[in-house]
């Protein structure tokens, strides 16, 4: 795949940076947008080379990477959705297929309602749709506690709590917050507070209002939305969110290899296989 072309687009309150990678040989496939929230484009660096048979667009959300946040107030899933729309509009490549990971798998839902013509097939991989969970009241308190911990004690203490939250299997008990705080060192984080409070996840996205999708409106949008889950993440909150979205839409969930970040491997997830993830993605898109 040739080197990407990198451009920017101005949106209300931010300047977004996006990349377009063209295939060496033009083919029949619809262009593919791959994005996360708040994960920046470089989080998909292991996946994108395995998608060289089609045009691939990636971008950094307004809170991440190379994008510039000019106004941090009023952040919401709907704001992120309009940003994604503006990126596709700027490329002139729509309609696009989409792989949306984690928070982006929530972002695509208001996007589908507002700009259905942008979208072909949408793979919504492990959306943390807290409002659809049976234990949503507990999870909302846990998310607020992580954000409050970040404000009070900084990155390491908050990330240790967040990681513990996202790897927990099954519904959260009412007394979960009564447990001792995790040691940041157990997760490879420093317990020292570096004084910064600009983390994209802990300082921005966790403070957004929860999003409750309208299943009737999404089904009527005409967008093919495929809720997806990781084969290795059964029982975790984002996996449960994917299953709940599938139930809401009346469709079967699609299983992908790996865990919540199955498109990238490393010391933290050596069994993830980006090539296998890409192969599954191509197969799902080509079933359309």
Where in this protein do the model-derived segments appear?
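Active-site loop/turn elements of alpha/beta-hydrolase fold enzymes
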Residues: 61-63, 127, 258
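Alpha/beta-hydrolase
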Residues: 138-252
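Conserved hydrolase catalytic core segment
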Residues: 94-134
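Glycine-rich phosphate-binding loop signature in dinucleotide/nucleotide-binding domains
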Residues: 26-27, 91-94, 288
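Conserved HGGG/HGGXW glycine-rich cap/lid loop of the alpha/beta-hydrolase fold
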Residues: 7-68
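Catalytic active-site module of serine/aspartate enzymes centered on a nucleophile-bearing elbow/loop
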Residues: 249-288
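Short, surface-exposed alpha-helical segments at coil->helix boundaries
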Residues: 45, 81, 239-243
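Active-site loop/oxyanion-hole signature of alpha/beta-hydrolase fold enzymes
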Residues: 63-97
């Amino acid at each position: 795949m040739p080197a990407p072309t990198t451009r920017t687009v101005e949106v209300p309150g931010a300047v977004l940076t996006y990349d377009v990678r063209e295939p060496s040989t033009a083919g029949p496939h619809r262009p593919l947008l791959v994005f996360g929230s708040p994960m920046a484009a470089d989080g998909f660096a292991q996946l994108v080379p395995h998608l060289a048979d089609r045009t691939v667009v990636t971008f950094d959300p307004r809170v991440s990477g190379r994008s510039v946040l000019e106004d941090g107030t009023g952040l919401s899933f709907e704001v992120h959705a309009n940003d994604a729309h503006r990126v596709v509009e700027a490329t002139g490549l729509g309609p696009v297929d989409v792989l949306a990971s984690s928070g982006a798998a929530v972002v695509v839902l208001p996007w589908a309602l507002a700009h259905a013509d942008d979208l072909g097939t949408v793979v919504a991989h492990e959306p943390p749709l807290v409002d659809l969970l049976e234990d949503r009241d507990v999870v909302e308190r846990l998310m607020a506690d992580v954000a409050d911990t970040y404000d009070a004690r900084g990155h390491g203490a908050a990330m240790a709590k967040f990681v513990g939250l996202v790897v927990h299997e099954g519904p959260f008990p009412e007394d979960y917050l009564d447990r001792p705080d995790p040691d940041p060192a157990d997760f490879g984080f420093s317990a020292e507070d570096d004084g910064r409070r600009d983390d994209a996840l802990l300082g921005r996205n966790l403070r957004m209002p929860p999003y409750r999708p309208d299943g009737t409106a999404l089904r009527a949008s005409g967008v093919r939305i495929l809720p997806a889950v990781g084969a290795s993440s059964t029982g975790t909150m984002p996996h449960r969110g994917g299953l709940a979205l599938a139930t809401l839409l009346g469709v079967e969930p699609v299983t992908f290899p790996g865990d919540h970040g199955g498109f990238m491997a490393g010391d933290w997830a050596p069994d993830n296989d980006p090539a296998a993830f890409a192969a599954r993605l191509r197969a799902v898109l080509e079933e359309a």
